[in-house]
Amino acid sequence: QTLALSTTSNQCSLKCAHCNGHYLNNMVPIEEYEEKVQSRNITSFLLSGGCSYEGDVPINTHINTIKNLKEQGYRLNAHLGLMDKDSIVELCKYLDIVSFDLVFDDETIREVYKMKKSKEDYIEVYNTIQEHTEVAPHICIGLKGGQIKGEYEIIEYLQKNPPNKLTFIVLIPTKGTEYENVEPPELEGVADILCEARINLPDTEINLGCMRPRGVYRKELDQLSIMCGVNRIVLPSRSAKNKAIEMNMTINECKECCVL
């Protein structure tokens, strides 16, 4: 019941190594949201889009539409990227939560995003958002071409001020991108990171997000996630549900974005 909207249609200036604008094609242009709402039982929106060369998602260009959505009672989650402080302050008046990718390895930032940004830039924006609305940090495991670089450092940083929610996603080698021929991170390494987060952030709700490889990898990852103490899995495989039942867990099904 959460509809993903792109504020830039299928356009992205960064053309990142792991995405190349591919996933924007799965989103609805924000100008067309009304017809989709009429045909589906939509209760919330994910506001997203492609990035500028500076790494921000320019959803503020549609602030009147965003304000209108909020006034209609929809819950709003957003991707802001490395947005400037003034725009963050203005937008957060209408946002229930922000999903924010944290990247701490400078080499990864240069290789994946082609930006001259640093860990400090991400921390600064993260803290600014935190001052004005709830933020759910996102960690992409294996972002640097399937390599684990910087993920543990992010978990260590989050221990200082644990978030209510933390979402993990996993690199998908995607056709038409620079990383189409790489291997996703090894499952053992992914599981170790999930366990590290669970142990060190005991009161944080940990989610396994929608962006993760499909097939056998996904089935095995989903089962491992249950065993690592993950709280929510987006579109879980049957094997994950069976594992949860086997472990006598209570299963609650939600219909919206995992951070809402």
List each model region and its residues.
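Conserved Radical SAM active-site core
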Residues: 3, 8-9, 21-135, 148-152, ...
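Conserved, mostly hydrophobic/aromatic
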Residues: 16, 47, 100, 197, ...
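Active-site-proximal loop/turn and secondary-structure-junction residues that shape catalytic pockets
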Residues: 51-53, 80-84, 104-106, 141-145, ...
